[in-house]
C-alpha cells in the first residue's frame, strides 16, 4: 500500500516534495506547533468551552437536557438514546476544565457544578430499562464495562468537587451492580454484561481501575480491611488481563489502545497500593 501511495502521489509532485510532505523535519526542544506563540492555557480553555457548548445539552436539545450528545447540539436527537459509556469520557474532559478554572473563576465554577448536578440527576443518560440492573443508584447497566466507566467518572467528579454524593453513588454502584457479577462466571472475573457472561479485557481493565480507586479511598480513610478487599477485587480483575496477555504484552487477539491503556493504568494503581513491582 505504501508503494502504491508513493507512486500515485509522485505523479502530482516530485519525489523530494513527497518526502517533505510525508517526513516533516523533527523538531526537538521547544517543539514548534505553529508559526506563532501558543498560549496553552488559553488554547485548552478555548477547546473546553467549545466542547461543552456544542456537546453538553445545557438546555433541551431534541429531547435531551443535562447530558452529553453524540452530535453537535444533539442535531440527530434520537441517536442519543443509547449514549451512555461515552458520557463518562465526555465528563472526564469537563472535569479537567473545571479543575483548571475552579480556583480563579467563581462564576464559571458554579456554572460547571450546575452541569455536574444536572448530569447526575439524569443518571448520565442511562438508558437501561431493567431496574434490577440499574440498581438503587440508577447508574447500573446491562453492560458491565459501561457501568465501570460511569463509576470512574463519578470518582473524578468527587475528586474535583468534594461532593460526597458522587462518591457514594460510585461506591454503591460498584458494590451493588458490578462486583456481585463476578459470581456469575466460573473464573470469578467480571462478565461483559448480564446478557453475555463472557469475561473480557475491555471490562476487567476499567473494573480493576475502579476497584483500585476504591482501595485508595478506603486506605486514606484508615479502613485497611476495606482497602484489602478492594485490592483483592482489583487483582482478580487484573488477572483476566494477564490471562489473555501474549508474551509481547499485547492483550487478546486484537490489541487495542483501549485495553492496553486500561491494563497499564490498572497495573500502575495496584503496584502503588501493594508495592509489588510485578504489576
Task: Provide a role label for each language-model segment.
Residues 15-138, 160, 164-188:
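Low-complexity, Ser/Thr/Pro/Gly-enriched N-terminal "stalk/linker" regions
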Residues 164-236:
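Aromatic- and glycine-enriched pocket-lining scaffold segments that form the walls
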Residues 29-37, 88-106, 149-163, 206-224, ...:
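Well-ordered alpha-helical scaffold segments within catalytic/enzyme domains
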Residues 121, 178-179, 216, 239-243, ...:
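Amphipathic alpha-helical segments of tetratricopeptide repeats
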Residues 230-232, 242-250, 254-259, 268-279:
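Extracellular glycoside hydrolase catalytic/binding regions
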Residues 1-8:
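Bacterial N-terminal signal peptides
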Residues 63-82, 128-157, 186-208, 247-268:
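Carbohydrate-binding/catalytic loop surfaces
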